[in-house]
Amino acid sequence: MKPVIALVGRPNVGKSTLFNRLTRSRDALVADLPGLTRDRHYGEGRVGGERPYLVVDTGGFEPVAKDGILFEMARQTRQAVEESDVIVFIVDGRNGLAPQDKSIADYLRKTGRPIFLVVNKAEGMKYTNVAADFYELGLGDPRAISAAHGDGVTEMINEALDVAYAGQPEESDEEKAQHGIKIAIVGRPNVGKSTLVNTLIGEDRVIAFDMPGTTRDSIYVDFERQGKKYTLIDTAGLRKRGKVFEAIEKFSVVKTLQSISDANVVILLLDARQDISEQDAHIAGFVVEQGRALVVGVNKWDGLDPHVRERTKSDLQRKLKFLEFAKFHFISAAEKTGIGPLMRSVDDAYKAAMSKLPTPKLTRALIEAVEFQQPRRRGPVRPKLRYAHQGGQNPPIIVIHGNALDAVTDTYKRYLENRFRETFALTGTPLRIEFRSSTNPYADKD
């Protein structure tokens, strides 16, 4: 599971600036939780090498607030701290130590989480001057950074990740071998995730084992269906009680994002009786960003008026158009209808995601696509697409070589993607296409 780094501090110390720096984007949000003024924002960490992690940006923290907006912001921050593996406590190097900093430090110490004290806005200042005040907090050596300019940020986050990953358990090869296709069932609260879980697991409720982490346990439930092995990743809050699993419908953004990253195939469950929300689209967007195979289940389809069904289908096509690669199934988890086709699509999506695409076949498909429709010229140059090979699996990556490929339009790229999908039956998985141009300065102009 990806570790979680929580950014905590009083208002205006630079938490959002650091969040944007770590996610390398001002719009890298993958999920928002509704609140009063400032919500918890979750993003994919992109600074710190190859180690994946999630970043949580919290509102300004007033730990002693008793009511109103400040109380709500404090509640949001406490929830983020509870979900985190490491806390980055940010203070303001320009304004110095504030009484609120002391209150926050007192609270954070009681959590038992690893804490990195970070002095922001330290650009152009001597470390000894910046750090002096903050030793009083008793949280070890302060780390001086400038979130706005990036100074010290990479070193700081790498140290935090060292600590976070030290607490992450590694699955043994034997444990990995026990698993079938890893499935994450994700969606908003009350869309029927726990009902679908119980329908899939049936009466057996077979092996469950915990992999202890630093702050949370991840539960995997192995089950068989029609002779095939699957492993359900706990997203609905499964907990064993006696010989039975109790499904607790408690939505956790962190749990959802971690489960998506860990899965082979994601089932995005929607409620046919509710409009598609921003939260649904955010979750779907994260699935695509992570390159995970996807099947969409539209639940509670039974008993719906035909006009409502048509309106729902139209709404899905309009709001989730970017999921055209995925199969949509209209099901009732409670009535156990549509579950068989849903699971067959899970199998197909996994097979597509893990496809091995031979270079000769890829190149032949590329040549046929170009012969049917050539890319447009850009000025005097027409892109020349020469050959293709596979660059990875889960999701499949197709690397195309040629000349002047930076002139290939997004429209033509989508055309190629659709041709490859059709040729190699790549339904249910995102598909990445990468272009690598020749550096030959004497490449032919068409």
Swiss-Prot record:
GO molecular function, one term: ribosome binding
Keyword Repeat: yes
The organism's place on the tree of life at top rank: Bacteria
UniProt cross-references to SMART domains, sorted A to Z: AAA
Entry-linked InterPro entries: AAA+_ATPase, G_ENGA, GTP-bd, GTPase_Der, KH_dom-like, KH_dom-like_a/b, P-loop_NTPase, Small_GTP-bd
Residue ranges constituting the EngA-type G domain according to the UniProt record: 3-168, 181-354
Keywords: GTP-binding, Nucleotide-binding, Repeat, Ribosome biogenesis
Location of the KH-like domain: 355-439
PANTHER family: GTPASE DER (PTHR43834:SF6)
Record-stated family: Belongs to the TRAFAC class TrmE-Era-EngA-EngB-Septin-like GTPase superfamily. EngA (Der) GTPase family.
PROSITE patterns the record matches: G_ENGA
Protein name: GTPase Der
Residue numbers binding GTP 1: 9-16, 57-61, 120-123
GO BP term, pick one: ribosome biogenesis
Subunit structure: Associates with the 50S ribosomal subunit.
UniProt xrefs under Pfam families: KH_dom-like, MMR_HSR1
Lineage: Bacteria, Pseudomonadati, Pseudomonadota, Betaproteobacteria, Burkholderiales
Positions contributing to GTP 2 binding: 187-194, 234-238, 299-302
Role noted for this protein: GTPase that plays an essential role in the late steps of ribosome biogenesis.
